[in-house]
Amino acid sequence: MNYIPYVIEKTGRGERSYDIYSRLLKDRIIMLSGEINDGVASSIVSQMLFLEAEDPEKDIYLYINSPGGVITSGMSIYDTMNYVKPDICTICIGQAASMGAFLLSCGTKGKRFSLPNSRIMIHQPLGGAQGQATDIEIQAKEILRLKSILNGILASNTGQPLEKIAKDTDRDFFMSAQESKEYGLIDNVLEKSFK
């Protein structure tokens, strides 16, 4: 069971209680924690759209601590990151693996960060298929199509050649924060808050 802390904010009109995520949203901070699925993606997308409507000129800060998750859910977040006008600052806290690492790399260039002891992992898409041979063939073609799309975006985000991305994502490829900076997934390793 997840415990969600509440914070008290004092104003000129008294006190107001917020759950911590609502309070962070006031500061344009979105937390992407845990597995990426349709529910998590809907929440992240909704928050980005809300923050764009509030102020399309101010950056949005997306903190990521995720083992990855469903490709289509992650792609809805990715598409929204590109769709909204504000720059998206991505910050890895803990880990960004699989789709989490992909989204970390998709922040606005120059605004992709990691804390020093985070780990980042990229790999090829995971999938499974069952049913008739033709159904399995259809699923295999689709996962190869998604692999090609993801590798192309990672190559663009990192500046690495597509062939290197394909080789490195063939199996789990773990990096430290510093190694992910050298690879091009992030732009800087943060020791202190930059806000």
Curated annotation (Swiss-Prot):
Catalytic center residues: S98 (nucleophile), H123
Catalysed reaction(s) here are: Hydrolysis of proteins to small peptides in the presence of ATP and magnesium. alpha-casein is the usual test substrate. In the absence of ATP, only oligopeptides shorter than five residues are hydrolyzed (such as succinyl-Leu-Tyr-|-NHMec, and Leu-Tyr-Leu-|-Tyr-Trp, in which cleavage of the -Tyr-|-Leu- and -Tyr-|-Trp bonds also occurs)
Which Gene Ontology cellular component annotation is one that this UniProt entry carries? endopeptidase Clp complex
Q: What class of enzyme is it?
A: hydrolase
Query: Which BP terms from GO are recorded?
Result: protein quality control for misfolded or incompletely synthesized proteins
Keyword set, alphabetical order = Cytoplasm, Hydrolase, Protease, Serine protease
Q: What is its main location?
A: cytoplasm
Q: What is this protein called?
A: ATP-dependent Clp protease proteolytic subunit
GO MF term set: ATP-dependent peptidase activity; ATPase binding; serine-type endopeptidase activity
| Subunit-level organization | Fourteen ClpP subunits assemble into 2 heptameric rings which stack back to back to give a disk-like structure with a central cavity, resembling the structure of eukaryotic proteasomes.
Q: Which gene encodes it?
A: clpP
- Sorted alphabetically, which Gene3D superfamilies does this protein's record hold? 2-enoyl-CoA Hydratase, Chain A, domain 1
Q: Which InterPro entries match?
A: ClpP, ClpP/crotonase-like_dom_sf, ClpP/TepA, ClpP_His_AS, ClpP_Ser_AS
- Role description: Cleaves peptides in various proteins in a process that requires ATP hydrolysis. Has a chymotrypsin-like activity. Plays a major role in the degradation of misfolded proteins.
Annotated source species: Wolinella succinogenes (strain ATCC 29543 / DSM 1740 / CCUG 13145 / JCM 31913 / LMG 7466 / NCTC 11488 / FDC 602W)
Subcellular location per the Swiss-Prot or TrEMBL entry: Cytoplasm
The coiled-coil segments of this chain are none
The Swiss-Prot or TrEMBL record describes its family as follows: Belongs to the peptidase S14 family.
Q: What is its EC number?
A: 3.4.21.92
NCBIfam families attached here?
Answer: clpP, PRK00277.1, PRK12553.1
Q: Does the keyword Transferase apply?
A: no
